[in-house]
């Protein structure tokens, strides 16, 4: 079965943050975990719901039963067939009202008129609020279309072109194009609506950047600053209907303006925070790149210095080894000129020495030659005797 064409928002963000958190933390909503089917939730609406305001009245000051069950429907994601069953239900008008609320929060704004048109003139009477004021289902549906506020809470905003088309369709049907006030739109912030607890709103709305819608009324409800009575008729007379809408409209205007300004300031703070984070990330990235490039430059320079020193050392060592080899070779191989001169010098010295000996002893070569012829035979015998020894004699 086809689901309802939604506006694309998550169901956790459909309601205001304060209301959503109160629903999720309520004991009654936790009891609804046991309801598993669509029909069980319908039976619970029939038995428990007696108004469709978002907050309970009296001293309870918590989320209403109707909105807890509406949130339960959010989690179930109803189909088109189930929604038609809700809108046409005959047992209780509050079952139908919860169905219309579901469409106002979940459905695409362009499809709202298609859903609501068959019920614009519905004359079934019921009391949307806890004050017992009666209205018809058709008026209630028109107020859901035309109003932005619903009993001190906010509806999703309908785009301006879609709203113009809705107003044009109502004009064609000769129906009012302004909210009638059945949903608390014209008396927003007054004491006859089931307001949220001030403590919850004051604490949670500030933390989430939302302006509490009750701020205009809490000043008037204070026992010290209570304004004098103005003859306000709660049951509603002609004079009250003429004056109170004007006051509530002006109050709503200023409250809306303040809330819009507050939201704009919060968004601007978020954007500035994001820009600051981006600038910080960019600085960190640039610093990391500079640090890496500096490290690479230092390592390259150290490597180049080391290679230069090593090459200089190698050239120096090679030159030293070549010089040593040359010196050794020169020492081992004397020049031939020095050798010839040495030989000549030695020959000269020998000749001079021989000349001196000849002068001293005479020329012995001639004497020996003369003696040799005379004594050749004798010398041979003597030599034989010398070689043979005494046995030869």
From Swiss-Prot:
The gene is SRL1. Residues 173-393 are annotated as: Disordered. It holds the Pfam family PRP38. It is found in: Nucleus. Residues 313-325 have a biased composition (Basic residues). This is Pre-mRNA splicing factor SR-like 1. It comes from the Eukaryota. A motif (Nuclear localization signal) lies at residues 301-308. Transmembrane segments: none annotated. Phosphorylated. The keyword Nucleus applies. Keywords: mRNA processing, mRNA splicing, Nucleus, Phosphoprotein, Spliceosome. One of its GO terms (cellular component) is spliceosomal complex. It comes from Arabidopsis thaliana. One of its GO terms (biological process) is response to lithium ion. Residues 249-312, 329-346, 356-385 have a biased composition (Basic and acidic residues). The lineage of its organism: Eukaryota, Viridiplantae, Streptophyta, Embryophyta, Tracheophyta. Belongs to the PRP38 family. The keyword Hydrolase does not apply. May be required for pre-mRNA splicing. Confers salt tolerance to LiCl and NaCl. Mostly expressed in siliques and leaves, also present in seedlings, flowers and stems, and, at low levels, in roots.
